[in-house]
Amino acid sequence: MITDPTAAGFCPEKLERLNTHLQERYITPKKIAGCQVLIKRKGIAAFSASLGQMDIARQKPMAADTLFRIYSMTKPITSIALMMLFEEGRFQLTDPVYKFIPSWRSHRIWVEGEGASMITRAPQSPMTIQHLLCHTAGLTYGGFLPGLELPVDAAYGAAGISRRGADTLETFAEKLANVPLLYDPGTRWSYSMATDVCGYLVEVISGQPFAQFLQERLFEPLDMPDTGFSIPDEKLDRFAACYERDRNKELKLQDDPETSRYRNPPTAPSGAGGLLSTMRDYSHFCDMLLQRGVFNGKQLISRATLELMTRNHLGQSSLAQMAVGGFSETSNEGVGFGLGFASTMDAAASGTVGEGDFYWGGLASTLFWVDPAEDLYAIFMAQLIPSSTFNFRGQIKNIVYGSLCEGAQS
């Protein structure tokens, strides 16, 4: 990719620190196998790099068309898809979820205890679609999140709920109807399976299979041919290996492309974390977000709807006041949450730059942010689980914003 940092308003020598930083701090000491980075401002690619390897055992260098597991970077895509139906008048954010999933009318709230001795009560108010999009619905991740054990998590396992094992999105949603909520909807924030339910709502409301809706309404208009829920055989050689660290902090294989579950199309595609994508494809999604819903002259979602989605929906609170447990794809201080995106409300409180940006990330150390005020977005792709291993977001943001020149000489 041709880059022009000067035209994009960056000092080239300063922005090149990003390459040096990632190479010397992470690639050379083998803390990660490889990564890709793209920085774009004012519609101009300012920085693009493919570093290290996509597969250590097979000695494959990171390539421009490498396919990544983007995990929770699926969530903003699913949220945009659902809000497309909102724009068609198919639902209101304040609609109770049971309007579309009748069995969810019976949800109860956890009070105390566990298993057969668990005490529950009726909710003070029904769960709405807005609650699902904001992760304030009272759902959890059923014990999946590292270091976070919640009292209702065991009920997910007892109900046979699995992020990967559902037969269909419908059976997944029906099983969730039998699990007590952690709190009254709208009163707290907890990272959860809620966006998987949003994917099912896309299916119910549109009358189309979820994956088909994404393909027709987003991936085709956005020219994202490599984004999907499984890897075709003809693209297998482009699929990156995924890694984790052993007890000695050495890289070890977590998911081999040759034997990966992604080789088989899922029967219940996860709207919360199931997509594979490339840097090119996801950059088109970010182009659309930065251009206020427009891509290649076509308005996919309105500016007003996108502004609603990226606004803080936690009232006057931040994640620091609302979150149950500490897990998130970001720090909680000074950060709000909207309809599928986090947003920096207070840069001083969050200890970062980019106030007013919106963003999210994925389990395998992928991340993006969009900053409308600076007309900028950034994407980072690696394949190291979990994403909390290194603070790539903070480091990359510091270098990127520290490289803005505004016409001065570096």
Identify the meaning behind each predicted range:
Residues 16-23, 43, 69-100, 195-203, ...:
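Active-site SXXK
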Residues 50-52, 255-256, 382:
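Short clusters of small/polar residues that mark proteolytic maturation junctions
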Residues 357, 364-373:
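Short, surface-exposed beta-strand/loop micro-motifs that present aromatic residues
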Residues 106-352:
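Short, surface-exposed loop or secondary-structure junction motifs
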Residues 383-409:
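Generic C-terminus detector
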Residues 6-70, 90, 106-113, 118, ...:
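Short, conserved catalytic-motif segment at the N-terminal edge
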Residues 368-369, 375-384:
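Short, well-ordered beta-strand elements
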Residues 11, 75, 278:
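Short, conserved phosphate/pyrophosphate- and ester-handling motifs at nucleotide-, phospho-/glycolipid
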